[in-house]
């Protein structure tokens, strides 16, 4: 099977990419493309269940695995739920900051996985061509109290990553 040659991640995994790759003894680094605080547009307001005047972090990062472009992430997080987020956290692990420093814990996530045509941004940062498809994983992550803490879109090259899901039927 050709997918065996790709990195496969469980679709229901919540530890984050840093922990996944540390377990596999892989070198994961990050490049910050954008890190701003802004007011959310109506789409982000709906996804994060916040008002128009509640600021969010707007984060664009390139995840680099073993010195190769791996995932292009665009993440929004409400500032009031993630106070004190700094570039140092973006360069290490945002999820470690949430779990260890802020004592926040996830209840689950809604994920939508689809194929898409590569954008100019994908081509620039993931080194793919304009005819290469990308795997787009959009997710909303929820805290245990039900509040959405993250909306993100992760763009993956078609030839380097996929996701698996074990679907067990219950009677």
Which residues does each predicted region cover?
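HTH-adjacent hinge/linker in prokaryotic transcriptional regulators
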Residues: 1-52, 82-92, 97-107, 162-171
């Amino acid at each position: 099977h050709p997918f065996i040659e790709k990195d496969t991640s469980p679709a229901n995994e919540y530890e984050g990419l840093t922990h996944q790759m540390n377990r596999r003894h892989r070198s994961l680094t990050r490049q910050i493309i954008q890190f701003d605080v802004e007011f959310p547009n109506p789409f982000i307001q709906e996804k994060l269940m916040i008002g128009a005047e509640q600021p969010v972090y707007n984060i664009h990062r390139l995840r680099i695995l073993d010195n190769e472009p791996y995932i292009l992430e665009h993440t929004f997080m409400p500032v009031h739920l993630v106070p004190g987020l700094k570039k140092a956290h973006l360069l290490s692990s945002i999820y470690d900051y949430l779990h260890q420093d802020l004592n926040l814990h996830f209840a689950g996530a809604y994920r939508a996985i689809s194929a898409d045509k590569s954008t100019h941004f994908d081509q620039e940062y993931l080194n793919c061509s304009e005819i290469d498809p990308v795997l787009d994983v959009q997710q909303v992550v929820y805290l245990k109290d039900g509040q959405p803490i993250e909306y993100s879109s992760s763009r993956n090259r078609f030839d380097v990553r996929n996701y698996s899901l074990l679907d067990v039927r219950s009677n």
